Design a protein with these regions (language model features):
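Acidic, low-complexity mobile loops and tails
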Residues: 1-61, 94, 98-117, 123-132
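Residue-level recognition of beta-strand microenvironments
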Residues: 22-24, 68, 85-88
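Short glycine-rich, polar/acidic loop-and-turn segments at beta strand-coil junctions
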Residues: 35-37, 69, 78
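Charged, well-structured alpha/beta interaction segments
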Residues: 57-73
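ATP/adenylate-binding site constellation spanning eukaryotic-like Ser/Thr protein kinases
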Residues: 76-79, 123
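Charged, amphipathic alpha-helical coiled-coil/dimerization segments
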Residues: 79, 83-84, 90-97
Length: 132
């Protein structure tokens, strides 16, 4: 397990208490799990994602991630409609471990309310939470 100061936590990403991240990507918002989350889970072997066109409210479960240690639910950091899923994760779920913010992103959404993104934690706030 990584020490808190070894975590890869980009500045341009917003974080949730449940360790998901969200980032503006053109007109869409890209969502995945943080480096902390993938590190805690260990080797990821399967990711279950929703279908394009599915809509979710903030805080609603949108999928699961399965590792050699556990199965964890994925929660929406903000409400919206799924516009894309990362199909590469079906064959290469380990991308979430090796590259949680780029190759390991999970879904993209058309956000219901853009203000929900800014309401999420900054890197500094997320680090503060992790340090307890």
């Amino acid at each position: 397990m990584k020490a808190i100061d070894e975590l890869n936590l980009p500045e341009d990403v917003r974080y949730t208490d449940d360790h998901e991240w969200a980032k503006q990507n053109g007109d869409a918002v890209r969502i995945g799990i943080s480096d902390y989350a993938q590190d805690q889970l260990g080797d990821i072997v399967f990711v279950e994602l929703p279908e394009v066109g599915d809509s979710f409210d903030k805080g609603e479960e949108f999928g699961t991630v399965e590792s050699v240690k556990a199965v964890s639910e994925l929660y929406m950091p903000m409400g919206g409609e799924v516009t894309a899923i990362n199909d590469a994760l079906a064959d290469e779920p380990e991308r979430v471990n090796s590259d949680p913010y780029d190759g390991g992103w999970m879904i993209e959404i058309k956000a219901n309310d853009a203000a929900e993104l800014e309401a999420l934690k900054s890197k500094a706030d997320y680090l503060e939470m992790l340090k307890g």
